[in-house]
From Swiss-Prot:
Localisation: Cytoplasmic vesicle, Secretory vesicle, Chromaffin granule membrane
Catalytic activity: monodehydro-L-ascorbate radical(out) + L-ascorbate(in) = monodehydro-L-ascorbate radical(in) + L-ascorbate(out)
Positions of the Cytochrome b561 domain: 19-220
Residue positions binding L-ascorbate: 80, 84, 153
Phosphoserine modified-residue sites: 247
Membrane-traversing stretches: 17-37, 52-72, 86-106, 125-145, 159-179, 199-219
Protein name, UniProt field: Transmembrane ascorbate-dependent reductase CYB561
Amino acid sequence: MEGGAAAATPTALPYYVAFSQLLGLTLVAMTGAWLGLYRGGIAWESDLQFNAHPLCMVIGLIFLQGNALLVYRVFRNEAKRTTKVLHGLLHIFALVIALVGLVAVFDYHRKKGYADLYSLHSWCGILVFVLYFVQWLVGFSFFLFPGASFSLRSRYRPQHIFFGATIFLLSVGTALLGLKEALLFNLGGKYSAFEPEGVLANVLGLLLACFGGAVLYILTRADWKRPSQAEEQALSMDFKTLTEGDSPGSQ
């Protein structure tokens, strides 16, 4: 850490973070198991191309996005710029993987002659992806691009935090809609007969909800927020003084 002694990590935080990672990794593994055991696996140049869509979305917009949000809780005492870069990189990886998932489903529909963007899941999915891209672009402009002033960053930060959590929540909800849509399409009336695929997918849905809940709980614990470093506190005091009409060095 730069500029002072490291702040103590809250006792329970590492356990909640570890639990969230266990849920997330199990979620990704179970998604792969569902697609491998019941949907034939994944291949780009065949009827299995569609299966790349759910796997990419779970990895990108759920697991990686959730972990990007947790960066400031996990790396509490590292240099702020290092943490920012990691936060931004995880979001880039999530965006790229999600884009692959979008290309997969649109390309599959084109080859099969299926209609696009008619379901609630598809509408929500496009909304989430666009919001996520805009959130990343604006966040990069404000927090990583050197031209943004400290005062501008301070004003935008609450909106960035709110929309980050909201987009993640929308991503989880959209994934649940897509899972239900896939089950109804593939199983039809057999879904109500407790088919093994349906049971596995229901457990997958519960894991989605639990991972989302675990991430949001960690994010909303005020006492688990990253402590301000010395240089951040100095900048904050300077900004406060400037907004009150005095110069930082007037006293």
